[in-house]
């Protein structure tokens, strides 16, 4: 069966991340139909009302409604932001056992509707839950996408832009690996205007930037309870790449099948994104140190996968 076309989106989970994502979609005019699904019906219906009052000032018309899993039947994209929340001091990987069980139920209900589109997963630990979504759905790997390191990469580019006194949009570089503590910056390919950035920074400064990227979520959670604006905007960017068939490179969570020497793991890597999902993984030329760190990140995730699916 051909993949579902159109631009209807079903959002499962209207907490801080989900509602921020819905707001970003509306403000950017990415879709003309959005269905909100949440166990807390009153909260979701409140979001629907609030968002509909904003459409008057949005760039394009958009139909926003409360719905159910049945609405996934003809959806082009289902975005999952539902799950147990991350608590202060708790790592993303601490969440895994709680959220895999939740996802088995969510994905099962979505597939029962006849859904034949693309999944975009944002709930943490996102690499494990994207893998779980792929397992539970039975869909081809290219049609199950995790948010991967799209947010970590944004943080990296922002900090590099601050350091280089340049717009972050002019900085090119990636964080790859787990969306979590074992992630790594790819200094060997970070550039501005085609010029390598790494030689212009001390080892201490590079370490400081890497740590600030890695620890950003913990600092934000400690300060305000959760992170949501950054990831919501990143999800909107991935959504636009899918629905507009952009063939753009974004650092997302996708299944490796031999790329960079690894397989059977969902992990954050640059990939070409279009209307079919992940068209192709872009293999970065890593130096020996980066290869070693990436392998450790892969093993971190595989150890968790083994504990769940052994």
Swiss-Prot record:
Residues bound to NAD(+): 17, 38, 43, 69, 83-84, 105, 122-124, 147
Q: What class of enzyme is it?
A: oxidoreductase
Give the reaction(s) catalysed: (S)-lactate + NAD(+) = pyruvate + NADH + H(+)
Q: Which residues carry this modification: Phosphotyrosine?
A: 218
Which GO terms label this protein's molecular function in UniProt?
Answer: L-lactate dehydrogenase activity
For this UniProt record, give its keywords in alphabetical order, as a comma-separated list: Allosteric enzyme, Cytoplasm, NAD, Oxidoreductase, Phosphoprotein
Activity modulation comment: Allosterically activated by fructose 1,6-bisphosphate (FBP).
Q: Which stretches are annotated as coiled coil?
A: none
List ligand-binding residues for beta-D-fructose 1,6-bisphosphate: 157, 172
Active site, per annotation:
179 (proton acceptor)
Give me the segments passing through the membrane.
none
The lineage's top-level taxon is Bacteria
Give a short account of what the protein does.
Answer: Catalyzes the conversion of lactate to pyruvate.
Quaternary structure? Homotetramer.
UniProt-recorded name of the protein: L-lactate dehydrogenase
Q: What is the lineage of its organism?
A: Bacteria, Bacillati, Bacillota, Bacilli, Bacillales
């Amino acid at each position: 069966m051909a993949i579902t076309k159109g631009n209807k989106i079903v959002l499962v989970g209207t907490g801080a991340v989900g509602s921020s994502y819905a707001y970003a979609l509306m403000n950017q005019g990415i879709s003309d139909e959005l269905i909100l699904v949440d166990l807390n019906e009153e909260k979701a219906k409140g979001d629907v009302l609030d968002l509909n009052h904003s459409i008057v000032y949005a760039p394009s018309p958009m139909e926003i409604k409360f719905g159910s899993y049945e609405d996934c039947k003809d959806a082009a994209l289902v975005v999952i932001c539902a799950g147990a929340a991350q608590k202060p001091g708790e790592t993303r990987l601490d969440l895994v056992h709680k959220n895999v069980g939740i996802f088995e139920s969510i994905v099962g209900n979505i597939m029962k509707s006849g859904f034949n589109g693309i999944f975009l997963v944002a709930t943490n630990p996102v690499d494990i839950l994207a893998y779980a979504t792929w397992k539970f759905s039975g869909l081809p790997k290219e049609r199950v996408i995790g948010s991967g390191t799209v947010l970590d990469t944004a943080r990296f580019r922002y900090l590099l832009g601050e350091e280089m006194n340049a717009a972050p949009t002019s900085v090119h570089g990636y964080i790859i690996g787990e969306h979590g503590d074992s992630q790594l910056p790819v200094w060997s390919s970070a550039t501005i205007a085609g010029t390598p950035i790494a030689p212009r920074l001390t080892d201490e400064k590079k370490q400081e930037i890497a740590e600030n990227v890695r620890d950003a979520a913990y600092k934000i959670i400690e300060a305000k309870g959760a992170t949501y604006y950054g990831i919501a905007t990143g999800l909107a960017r991935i959504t636009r790449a899918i629905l507009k068939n952009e063939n753009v490179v974004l650092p997302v969570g996708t299944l490796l099948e031999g790329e960079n020497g690894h397989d059977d793991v969902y992990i954050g890597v640059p990939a070409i994104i279009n209307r079919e999902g992940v068209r192709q993984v872009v293999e970065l030329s890593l130096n020996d140190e980066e290869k070693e760190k990436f392998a450790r990140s892969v093993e971190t995730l595989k150890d968790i996968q083994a504990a769940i699916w052994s």
